[in-house]
């Protein structure tokens, strides 16, 4: 029987325009308000047999607020951004423009001294493919948007450059149905958000 792994994007901890690499900040008031607003649509996922989350404070808080009581999975951590950790993309670009350009152009490169995009996607995909087959049924995982993008690129076997074209919004949900390297994408009830947020 195939698995159904539903990814829920963690609520935000800042304006989406101020997102930082490997952001360890807790949910802000806007994030908490968004969780409360989205909870009617996302609470039913608490019935999943297995409930996981990334180790970030906002992933754990989102999962707890939705009643998932998730188990932290280190493999669902955000991409290791090395010396760019805590910076916005604009800040990294201002400090090291050629390194950022190289990182965006080459998924195998890690000019920041951390993890390459290729290694990050492989790590997240490895977690996805090692879900035990006898755990058939429902799995929910609260994670950072970057982790969900990595899971989608891996599962759908699309070009790595597709990663940059996926826009995973806070508290959106998407499901992957399948197992062992054969996955299908299913869109869940994604909460509409005002444009420009």
For every predicted segment, state its role.
Residues 1-4, 73, 79-91, 153-197:
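Acidic, low-complexity terminal tails and accessory targeting/binding regions
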Residues 2-71, 113:
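Active-site-proximal alpha-helix that buttresses catalytic centers in soluble enzyme cores
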Residues 5, 49, 135-146:
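Generic beta-sheet signal
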Residues 26, 66-125, 165, 187:
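Phosphate-handling substructures
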Residues 36-43, 121, 125-133:
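Generic structural signal for well-ordered alpha-helical scaffold segments
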Residues 45-75, 101, 177-197:
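Conserved histidine-centered catalytic loops in small-molecule metabolism enzymes
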Residues 53-54, 122, 142-143:
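Short beta-strand scaffold positions
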Residues 145-149, 178:
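GST superfamily/GST-like fold recognition
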